A protein has these predicted regions:
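Active-site-adjacent structural elements that line small-molecule/cofactor binding pockets in enzymes
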Residues: 1-179
């Protein structure tokens, strides 16, 4: 953020709280809809989830598993929306599915906010650094359609209102689906 956009990176929760407060008081000059649009924020840790609870209509956690969904719902309570992201790979061969997942995971495994969250979820530094099978199995859903459906159901049973799936291409090309 600082290097590319020349923005000052501050404490995430304080920065987001200030942004939400400024957004709430900004003039709105377009034609109003009958209902105001919902505001959800990307939230992983307990403090950001608490901010989502108190200042928005919900949270959108990214790159997590059902155990995180349970924790997020416990913090949010019953009212706010919980719309989680789940990466899915339609591949039944465990070794192949995990190998397809690893290049995607490598994009994120050095970012402190994700690392901290995965540690909170019970993964180890070794799991994260080496993109272990345990890490992949916790953060990706892979298998046949029934296995993917089961993982989505695990999120729903853990308290998700909606599961946003992110298909990972089985041909290894990001952004291009082959199924």
């Amino acid at each position: 953020v600082e290097g590319v956009r020349k923005l000052e990176y501050g404490p995430p929760v304080t920065t987001m709280r200030n942004y939400l407060e400024q957004m709430g008081t900004a003039p709105y000059t377009a034609v109003r809809e009958e209902t105001d649009p919902l505001t959800l924020i990307a939230a992983l840790g307990p403090k950001m989830l608490e901010l989502a609870k108190t200042h928005t209509q919900g949270a959108h956690p990214y790159f997590t598993g059902p155990s995180h969904t349970k924790m997020a719902r416990d913090i949010l309570g019953e009212g706010p929306l919980l719309c989680v992201e789940q990466k899915v790979i339609l591949e039944t061969d465990a070794d192949k599915a995990r190998e397809l997942a690893r290049p995607i995971a490598k994009i994120y495994n050095r970012l402190p906010n994700y690392r901290n969250n995965w540690l909170r979820m019970g993964l180890t530094e070794d799991d994260i650094d080496n993109l272990s099978d345990r890490f992949i199995d916790e953060t990706f859903a892979w298998g046949d359609a029934d296995a993917l459906r089961e993982r989505i159901n695990e999120h729903m049973q853990a308290g998700a209102d909606h599961v946003c799936i992110q298909p990972i291409n089985t041909n290894g090309n990001v952004g291009e689906l082959d199924w």
